[in-house]
Amino acid sequence: MKKFIFVIVTLLLFNLVFSQQISKVAISGNGQLDVFAFGLDEQVQIYLSKDGNISKWGFDRFIGYQENYNGDLLPYVGRIEYYSQNDDESLRGKIKYIGKTLLTYYASYENEALKGKLKSIGAINFDYYLTYEDAAYRGLIKTIGRKMIVWYASYENVDLRGKLKNFGSTTLIYYNSFEDKAFRGKIKSIDRFAFVYYSSFEQYSSSLKTGSTLININGIKYYLKSY
């Protein structure tokens, strides 16, 4: 009986931890990070900006049969709860529950630079670069769970500053300001995957020439947008 209870508890904890996970990293056409996408239960997705703000969330009807390239989300009809006026001033009005997933935020008594920022999505915790750190990435996400997020610093090439450099063990490299104007600043490689663009002298200038717009690295999708 004890063994049975242990198995049930273990399965419940496993489901709690893995029901929230980062599902996609979207990169804009200019090389800037567009969103980090997180998958919850019931085909719900949360889109976060690089400074940890929730840009949108909702039901992703495309999950299971095709990629949601445009990021179109439908209203979620399950449990939705918000922090009330009785909660800490930095939390009031923010989304608290989406289904059974709890979202928490840094409170008003915590570090001034963190107040109101997203602290956790379920079991996934977030930390941020603080005000004393490099100007190119202060205020941006520093960790997502156990993954370290590194951004190009202000002393690096002008077309790289503030762009995503490392997501955990995955490295992102960009064309710098000395490259052809048609693709300077664009993503050049993600891990072992390379991207080549049409030059300013070619017909489809700046469009992707070789490389896939959607790749999968260690279970996380990286999507290169054309805009």
Question: Where are the predicted features?
Answer:
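Conserved positions within tandem-repeat grammars
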Residues: 89, 93-96, 101-104, 112, ...
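Eukaryotic tandem repeat interaction scaffolds
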Residues: 131, 153-154
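Long terminal segments
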Residues: 2-3, 20-73, 148, 154-227
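Sec-dependent N-terminal signal peptides
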Residues: 4-14
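Surface-exposed acidic loop/strand-edge motifs in secreted or periplasmic proteins
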Residues: 50-101, 106-110, 124
